[in-house]
């Protein structure tokens, strides 16, 4: 099966097995808005491993989003209206819908200045890795892949939409996510991503200990945590977030030499 055939097959399978996506797309379209399945939801659907959480992006404002969702369910909640996100439970699925965003970062902070965007392309380019920067129109099934994320899935590569130095400067926690996805997806980082992680390892220190811990826990809970931990050690990030880990590796290497 060719890649285009596989793409078509996986999209057809998604809409057949999960008609909710089409229902949501139609509801937003009838209200005059776009709705796109996005991020890890698209990645997982294309890999045949879709979970029970669905992430969408839209040109609708949070108030408009809530109004549309209320036509399908009474179980809606405000996840973070300031960030443009409204949540809902429909059938057995948890749905999060976020208004198109363009984020700006200050050099000394990880917290973005949130602004609503006008286009899907603006929203996708701000995402962490190309494999998470794809979108699928929930009404028309049109596939958007401006940063060649599908090719990176096929190649098993982690690459950033922006140059990695800019991406990791904006949000250093993305370096921890690279380790998690290495373990979770079985992918490898590109040479450029690895070099940027090595050069910018110290920038992880601006991230709160709680958020680092949460990301590290997600890595440890994957089926293959060693791959991600090895990446943290070889890039020097572990020296800042888990200094015991490089020390254990050094002790093991010295033991093997004796």
Question: What do these predicted ranges mean?
Answer:
Residues 1-258:
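Catalytic cores of the polymerase beta-like nucleotidyltransferase superfamily
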